[in-house]
């Protein structure tokens, strides 16, 4: 199939084998059910190799660094398993489970290949340069700025790009598909542990995947009430692009880029809690995969090995999604406070202190490894020392406000306005009704002193408290919606197993009602997923990448001067194709630097060289307009690729110039 034509299969299989076998050997020190160990080993190996790659790539060429990370993962597993009886003699391979996992990962990857939605303009540019050695990454649109962002999944994808020769657009989809499939299986493992039922495990995985917002329930309201509600809200973002009012947009298509053959109905979306069927952003489902691994492994190992593995997973979580990491740590604080209040003593139990090395170690690594927390730390050092030589891209700040829920589509929804309650329920979805069962589970976990899982449950508290905050940083106000939506993901982890146990001895009528509730909660996700399936046979690159760009990528990626800047009238295209940075602004999207516009409107090879650009990546219309500006002998034409129609007419063209000698 076409996916295999986009990458080298043997290096990919070898890389996955290093991760899986290394992680499997490490887990010899953990008491795990046989059916869990293989896939947990793959996830652990993937995670450990990513963090090792994040370290080794700072000193070595990425090809060597990435292979070394995989080999080190295997060697660590061999060393840790050696003092015990090697588990080879007890080797069990649940073939059916592995086949189902591989099929699911492949299926999800194919869907991703047919879609280009959510931040590809941001992630593919960064991924392309990371695969060539920009680790820790710098902002692709101005490399003077540190890219203080959650780039764990991009690290995984960068290994696919460099070692398996997958172009960024395929590597990103493969990384998302792989980690999402692991997330769903881990969710099933958790449910099976709680219920002992394979049926509950399968239902829980489906619930985790499909459940999200339930905006369609607004259509159940009387038209007069819906009209009043619509008049009380102001759409923002893609919501405003999709319609003039809430009442009107419910009948419209959702206007977002990168869709497949069929548009998405707006009523199936959510600006607060989209289902995992829409996990096409730069972090995918990687943070949930890591949280589930922490929960499944905590308490299953002993001594320093367990602490080291948990510290690695927690550090990776910080690099995957800083919000999830911060809320997990805050949840641990809330869980401890509940324990202190319950026992009326500040003398904390030994079971809590036993996890201190992992929690503290993960936090220290998070501050040093790169990403958001490293950016915050460098920002503090810069303020104290009066220097901003390592300026971070994102600034974090908050202000207090009256209780409000922020939807990335519907805007601000006040809890003081009863009309907004209907919209809040529609944006959060029906999983919110599991809240009492989840807190009851948290109380039980505290009694049992299962601290890291209790931390996950009580991480709902800081998430819920964000209704009193307004995000005033420079990542956009809707960054707050991810924080508020966090508690809903906690609920989705537990909804099926907790309700399964509660309803097991109840009447069939209640059980059928719960099944109906689950189907209603999953309706939007099922609808969106069904519209994504037709995209599978039609792979795309990205909204800004054409087939001719993919050919230029094959010819020139990784073959130009490292660290050089590229100029392209489409700032995201040149960096993705060539793996280089540009210098166009401090935001994604249209350039913000006036000097960039001056060069674009009046190109001169000498001025471009003085501005720091060595390479120019030019499209057909721009080349036709300004070709005579590049007649100087100092300009070297590295490539002039054209596509022609049957009548000989040029339909697409890319010209790659080197102006490094224009001084």
Predicted regions and their residues:
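Membrane-interface alpha helices of multi-pass inner-membrane proteins
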Residues: 272-273, 294, 306-322
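Active-site lumenal/periplasmic loops and adjacent helix-entry segments of GT-C-fold
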Residues: 102-287, 539-543
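Hydrophobic, aromatic-rich transmembrane alpha-helices
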Residues: 288-298, 331-332, 336-343, 356, ...
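Membrane-embedded, hydrophobic transmembrane alpha-helices
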Residues: 1-85
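Start-transfer (signal-anchor) and selected internal transmembrane alpha helices
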Residues: 60-110, 198-205, 356, 663
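Hydrophobic/aromatic-rich transmembrane helices and adjacent perimembrane loops
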Residues: 177-180, 326-332, 475-504
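Extracytoplasmic
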Residues: 503-663
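Membrane-interface helix-loop-helix junctions at transmembrane boundaries of multi-pass membrane enzymes
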Residues: 87-95, 297-306, 341-353, 434-461, ...
């Amino acid at each position: 199939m076409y996916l295999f034509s986009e990458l080298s299969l043997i290096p990919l299989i070898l890389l996955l084998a290093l991760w899986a076998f290394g992680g499997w050997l490490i887990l010899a020190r953990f008491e795990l059910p046989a059916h869990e160990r293989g896939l947990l080993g793959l996830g652990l190996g993937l995670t450990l190799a990513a963090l090792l790659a994040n370290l080794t790539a700072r000193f070595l060429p990425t090809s060597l660094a990435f292979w070394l990370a995989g080999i080190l993962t295997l060697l660590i597993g061999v060393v840790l398993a050696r003092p015990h009886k090697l588990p080879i003699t007890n080797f069990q391979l649940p073939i059916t489970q592995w086949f189902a996992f591989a099929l699911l990962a492949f299926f999800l990857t194919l869907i991703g290949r047919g879609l280009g939605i959510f931040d590809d303009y941001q992630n593919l540019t960064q991924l392309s340069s990371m695969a060539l050695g920009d680790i820790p990454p710098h902002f692709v649109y101005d490399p003077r700025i540190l890219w203080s962002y959650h780039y764990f999944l991009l690290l995984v994808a960068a290994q696919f790009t460099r070692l398996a020769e997958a172009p960024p657009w395929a590597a990103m989809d493969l990384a998302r598909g792989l980690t999402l499939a692991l997330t769903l299986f881990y969710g099933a493992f958790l449910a099976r542990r709680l219920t002992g039922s394979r049926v509950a495990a399968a239902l829980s995985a489906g619930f985790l995947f499909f459940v999200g917002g339930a905006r369609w329930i607004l259509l159940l309201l009387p038209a007069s009430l819906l009209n009043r509600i619509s008049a009380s809200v102001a759409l923002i973002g893609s919501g405003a692009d999709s319609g003039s009012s809430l009442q009107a947009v419910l009948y419209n298509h959702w206007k977002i880029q990168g869709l497949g053959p069929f548009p998405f109905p707006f009523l199936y979306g959510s600006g607060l809690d989209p289902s995992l069927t829409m996990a096409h952003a730069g972090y995918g489902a990687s943070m949930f995969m890591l949280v589930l691994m922490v929960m499944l492994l905590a308490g299953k190992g002993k001594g320093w090995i367990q602490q080291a593995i948990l510290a690695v997973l927690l550090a990776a979580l910080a690099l995957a999604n800083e919000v999830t990491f911060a809320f997990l740590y805050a949840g641990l604080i809330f869980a401890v406070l509940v324990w202190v209040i319950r026992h009326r003593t500040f003398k904390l139990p030994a079971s809590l202190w036993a996890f201190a090395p992992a929690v503290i170690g993960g936090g220290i690594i998070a501050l040093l490894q790169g990403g958001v927390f490293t950016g915050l730390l460098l920002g503090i050092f810069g303020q104290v020392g009066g220097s901003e030589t390592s300026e971070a891209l994102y600034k974090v700040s908050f202000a207090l406000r009256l209780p409000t829920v922020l939807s990335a589509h519907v805007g601000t929804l006040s809890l003081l306005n009863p009309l907004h309650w209907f919209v809040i329920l529609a944006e959060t979805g029906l999983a919110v009704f599991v809240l009492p069962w989840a807190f009851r589970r948290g109380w039980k976990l505290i009694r049992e002193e299962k601290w890291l899982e209790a931390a996950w449950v009580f991480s709902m508290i800081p998430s819920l408290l964000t209704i009193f905050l307004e995000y005033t940083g420079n990542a956009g106000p809707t960054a707050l919606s991810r924080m508020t939506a966090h508690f809903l993901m906690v609920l989705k982890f537990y909804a099926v197993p907790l309700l399964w146990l509660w309803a097991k001895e109840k009447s069939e009528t209640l059980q059928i009602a719960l099944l109906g509730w689950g189907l209603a909660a999953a309706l939007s996700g099922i609808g969106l997923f069904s519209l994504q399936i037709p995209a599978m046979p039609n792979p795309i690159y990205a909204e800004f990448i054409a087939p001719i760009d993919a050919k230029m990528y094959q010819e020139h990626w990784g073959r130009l001067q490292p660290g050089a800047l590229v100029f392209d009238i489409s700032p995201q295209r040149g960096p993705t194709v060539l793996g280089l940075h540009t210098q166009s602004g401090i935001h994604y999207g249209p350039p913000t630097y006036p000097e960039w516009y001056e060069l674009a409107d009046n190109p001169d090879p000498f001025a471009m060289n003085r501005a720091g650009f060595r390479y120019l990546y030019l499209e057909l219309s721009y080349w036709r307009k300004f070709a005579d500006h590049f007649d100087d002998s100092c300009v070297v034409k590295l490539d002039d690729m054209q596509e022609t129609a049957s009548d000989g007419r040029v339909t697409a063209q890319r010209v790659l110039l080197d102006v490094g000698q224009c001084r």
